[in-house]
Amino acid sequence: MKVLVLYDYPPSPGGLATQGDLLLRGLREMGVDAHPANFESAQEKEWYYRWFAPDVIVGVGYWGHTPHLVLHSQRYGITSIPWLVANGYMANYQEILEALPLILVTSNWVKKIYMRDGLSGKNIEVLHVGCDTDSFIPRDKNDPKIASVREALGVAPDQIMILTVGGDAASKGAHEVMQALAINDTKAPDWKYICKVWPQPRTEQQNLADLQLAANLGIDKNVVYTTSRVSRNFMPYLLAACDIYAAPSRLEGFGMIQIEANACGKPVIGVKAMGMLDTLVHGKTAFLADVAQEIRLREAFLGDESGYESGHKFVFKRPRIVDYRASVHDIANYLMDLMQNAKLREEMGKEGRKRAVEHFDYRVIAKRFVEIVSKRLGIS
């Protein structure tokens, strides 16, 4: 089997790039002849089509990337398999995707989104995202690399470090976590809440709003926002430095960092919805808060990134649930349980590590990819 993997290559620290890069690594370790290419580079892709002649192309992205992941290779008569995430709804390319022999999606929730918005599901298979469980491992708090992370973030050795990581923090549920911490503040052990966000123009105003919320709640002295650029090499140490990973995300098609936190032996706070129903086990590897609110959308303004002219108004036949809000009181209760009980944190962390290795290791995912392609397309 010869496979061309299309993604954000060379890989940035982002989730989609990591998703593609770990599949590539897993395939190569299995002995599969696999090569990477940037999903937007028409010239590079055509070069591979001509000399490599891949049996199959797998492309990482979402429905809006269909021209790059599917249409380009179809002009050359090569089988293309998009491996898709979801952004809450699907608003174009239904006929093109429905006609494909195979579509991969990152969770059962993503599959439901695509079926809700026009696909039959007959050609959709769930393939979860891989995790490098050799890098994301439990580490001792006294390890100088771990102690240095905590010290640099202003976290004392005896403080409970709660961590959220994302492009921005609000979309990962930071507002709900802050409100929960404000409820617990005077009753809880000493704590520090760290939000690691990616430096980009769209998040600057969001970060200010988040910090204003912390001030309004009276917990701003215990909330730290860090916006430095970091590589994937740093992430295992950042996650291993925390005591609790909190990400009751508002929109989560899979939840890669939640799995990485579990792989580091950390308990996770999530929400009982979306991709987290696939990745986390309530009461065992994580605590999943109930959904308190569903946010529905009647219309959206789209542009060329979605295959429309700029400013196109797309009206849904029925309002779509596009994201969720977790129960603040559930989060508060679960945080208190974990903050007060080191043994519970350790036990849930061990279960999380075990599940991450068994179900989400990148080698497991690569093997599953080969099995699906062989069964569905008869390519070996």
Question: What role is predicted for each listed range?
Answer:
Residues 156-172, 178-181, 194, 319:
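Conserved donor-binding/catalytic core segment of Leloir-type glycosyltransferases
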Residues 207-230:
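Nucleotide-activated donor-binding/catalytic signature segment of Leloir-type glycosyltransferases, i.e.
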Residues 137-155:
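A short helix/loop element that forms part of the nucleotide-sugar donor recognition site in Leloir-type
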Residues 267-270, 280, 287-289:
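Short hydrophobic beta-strand element within catalytic cores of glycosyltransferases
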Residues 316-319, 330, 336-337, 344-358:
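A short, well-ordered alpha-helix in the C-terminal region of glycosyltransferases
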Residues 109, 130:
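Carbohydrate-associated surface elements
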Residues 250:
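Aromatic "clamp/platform" in nucleotide-sugar-dependent glycosyltransferases that forms part
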Residues 237-242:
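Short alpha-helical donor nucleotide-sugar binding micro-motif in glycosyltransferases
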